[in-house]
C-alpha cells in the first residue's frame, strides 16, 4: 500500500468539499486492510508495518473528517505556511467581528439568551467559512487566501471552545 497524501490513501479527490459518507467508507475499507489483527500471525516487522499503516489511516481520517483540519491540511500541502503562532494579521472587518464576539461572550457568561445567540452566530460563521473555503480551494485554487480564512476559522473555534466552557450564571 502506498499513498502520497491523505486523499490518495483513501482514493478520494483532493478537494475541500468531501462527502462524509464516502470518506468514512473509504477509511473503513483501508482500516480493514491494514488492521493489526489481520497480521497476528505475521512476522514482527509485518505487524509493526501494519500498525504504522493503521495509525496513518486513523490520523488521515481524523484530519479529513474535520473541515477546518482538512482546509489546513490542503493549504499546507499546497505549500502555504499558515504561521498560526506568529501571523496574527487579519482582515480589519474580521478583527471588528472578533471584538464584537468577545463582548457577546462576556454577556453570554451572565445571560442564557446571549449564550444561545452567540452559539448560533458562531455556527453560522462556521458554515460561511466552509462555503468560502470550498470556493477558494476547490474553485479558485487560492491557497494563500484560504490560509487566511483558516486562521480566522481557528479563532472562531477557539471562541466556540471558550463559549462551551462558559456557563451563564443564574
Curated annotation (Swiss-Prot):
Protein family (similarity comment): Belongs to the HscB family.
Stored Pfam families: HSCB_C (PF07743)
Entry keyword annotation includes Endoplasmic reticulum: no
PANTHER family: IRON-SULFUR CLUSTER CO-CHAPERONE PROTEIN HSCB (PTHR14021:SF15)
Keywords from the UniProt entry: Chaperone
Entry protein name: Co-chaperone protein HscB homolog
Taxonomy, superkingdom: Bacteria
GO MF annotations in UniProt: ATPase activator activity; protein-folding chaperone binding
Extent of the signal sequence: none
InterPro entries referenced in this protein's UniProt entry, alphabetically: DnaJ_domain, HscB, HscB_C_sf, HscB_oligo_C, J_dom_sf
Physiological role: Co-chaperone involved in the maturation of iron-sulfur cluster-containing proteins. Seems to help targeting proteins to be folded toward HscA.
Assigned GO CC terms: iron-sulfur cluster transfer complex
BP terms from Gene Ontology: [2Fe-2S] cluster assembly; protein complex oligomerization; protein folding
Assembly, per entry: Interacts with HscA and stimulates its ATPase activity.
Residues annotated as domain J: 5-79
